[in-house]
Design a protein with these regions (language model features):
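ABC-family P-loop ATPase nucleotide-binding domain
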Residues: 1-30, 236-251
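ABC family nucleotide-binding domain
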Residues: 20-229, 234
Length: 251
């Protein structure tokens, strides 16, 4: 019998004073590929709190991306419930989930998905045009250190700069939560540190709950809490009493 890790330890930065942002209870996800049954998640319980910087750590195939997609309303669990504040995402229809993603969640993926024919400013403005209370696109680009590159097209930007535009696009709608799936996976170490510093700044200055998926244990050193997955299960949850700044990381 497996005992689930305790999540009741005191938070070293006092970030658990408010209600949980996400509460996942007994999340199981099963995929069927022909006659093959793949269980990506197995009875996962996890609570995320406002203002945390959480790293989901584990090897490829451990269930990290599946969990992130379920939290973000991009996928649904086969069993279990997911709540965002007092909203039961598990019982929400497609329209409600679209509204949830639009109003509350910013996504950053390994690949930037910028529109090549639009400038950095115009790529960010795609989000600000539909958000409830958006930043100005220029303000979002300044937040990620790209104010002077606002009128450049993606082809004129480095990989790290393109990822920062993607982060600007994600934060321009002022999301409550920033969900990042291997945001440094396509970048070298030095460029990855720059990108992580941007996510760190968003978490610190805007109070945005940040969740970062990675297989890189070094990146976990900057988290306030580390959730380690293996084989579709959470095998460890640990507090980090002294998170390292992104600028101090190297791999």
């Amino acid at each position: 019998m497996t005992t689930r890790p305790s999540q009741n330890n005191a938070d070293p930065r006092g970030l658990r004073n408010g209600p949980p942002v996400f509460a996942a209870d007994g999340i199981t996800k099963t995929y069927h590929v022909g006659d093959v049954r793949v269980q990506a998640l197995r009875g996962v319980d996890l609570t995320l709190y406002r203002g945390e910087f959480v790293v989901l750590l584990g090897p490829s195939g451990s269930g990290k991306s599946t969990l992130l997609n379920i939290l973000g309303g991009l996928d649904a669990p086969s069993e279990g419930r997911v709540h965002y504040l007092d909203h039961d995402l598990s019982a929400s229809d497609d329209r409600a989930l679209t509204r949830f993603r639009r109003d509350h969640v910013g996504f950053v993926f390994q690949f930037y998905n910028l529109i090549p024919s639009l400038t950095a400013r115009e790529n960010v403005a795609l989000v600000t045009d539909i958000a409830r209370d958006p930043m100005d696109a220029g303000e979002a680009l300044e937040m990620v250190g790209l104010a002077d590159r606002a009128d450049h097209f993606p082809a004129q930007l480095s990989g790290g700069e393109q990822q920062r535009v993607a982060i600007a696009r994600a934060i321009a709608k002022r999301p409550d939560v920033l969900l990042c799936d291997e945001p440094t996976g396509a970048l070298d170490s030095a460029t990855g540190v720059v990108v992580l510093s941007v996510i760190e700044r968003v978490n610190r200055e805007l109070g945005t709950t940040a969740v970062v998926i990675t297989h890189n244990a070094v990146i976990a050193e900057m988290a306030t809490r580390v959730v380690r997955l293996s084989g579709g299960e959470i095998v460890e949850i640990r507090e980090n009493p002294a998170p390292r700044p992104a600028s101090g990381l190297s791999w």
